[in-house]
Amino acid sequence: MAIKTVLGEAQQIKIATDLIVLGARLQVLQEETSLSRERLLKLYKEVRGESPSKGMLPYSTDWFISWQPNIHSSLFMGIYQFMIKNAGVDGVHALISAYRLYLDQVQGIEGGEVVLSITRAWFLVRFFKAGMMQLITCRECSGKFVTHTNELHNNYVCGICHPPARAGKTNAKARLLAGHAE
């Protein structure tokens, strides 16, 4: 049985609080901290002012492959791997730091829309660790993009270099353009 310390518990509460602020689901908190479900529920209500959402987690590797999610997932994964390799952080600390940097990048763009939630980012990291997904280099721009591990990747071209026909035709973009027209 592990001996609990006040400092250790404070660190677990800090991790849980950071994840809650970023929008993590309760199941993520349970996996990444040693706090009890009851403590996490109480902390969640204290931080967010509401109970955590219920239901199944978004578990699918296919979501990360579609056009816009792939761009955002690839950006996040590039940041995450950079943090692991160069910043001396790992585990949940790398997830939190990389996700905050991802938010800074996306929200720094006019009309930038956050597509990747912290929960999906957490799953993406798990999929990479399980060998289900990988980064592959685009032959046109040399950027690295998220793909399934067992797919053929000869002459891979990313969704930025070769966007789908309806790419960028979102309601958010239409609202943004309407705002500039006024």
Curated annotation (Swiss-Prot):
One of its GO terms (cellular component) is cytoplasm. Heterohexamer composed of two FlhC and four FlhD subunits. Each FlhC binds a FlhD dimer, forming a heterotrimer, and a hexamer assembles by dimerization of two heterotrimers. GO terms for biological process: bacterial-type flagellum organization; positive regulation of DNA-templated transcription; regulation of bacterial-type flagellum assembly. The keyword DNA-binding applies. Zn(2+) binds at residues 138, 141, 158, 161. It is found in: Cytoplasm. Belongs to the FlhC family. It comes from Gallionella capsiferriformans (strain ES-2). GO terms for molecular function: DNA binding; zinc ion binding. Binds 1 zinc ion per subunit. Functions in complex with FlhD as a master transcriptional regulator that regulates transcription of several flagellar and non-flagellar operons by binding to their promoter region. Activates expression of class 2 flagellar genes, including fliA, which is a flagellum-specific sigma factor that turns on the class 3 genes. Also regulates genes whose products function in a variety of physiological pathways. It holds the Pfam family FlhC. Its main location: cytoplasm. This is Flagellar transcriptional regulator FlhC. Keywords: Activator, Bacterial flagellum biogenesis, Cytoplasm, DNA-binding, Metal-binding, Transcription, Transcription regulation, Zinc. The lineage of its organism: Bacteria, Pseudomonadati, Pseudomonadota, Betaproteobacteria, Nitrosomonadales.
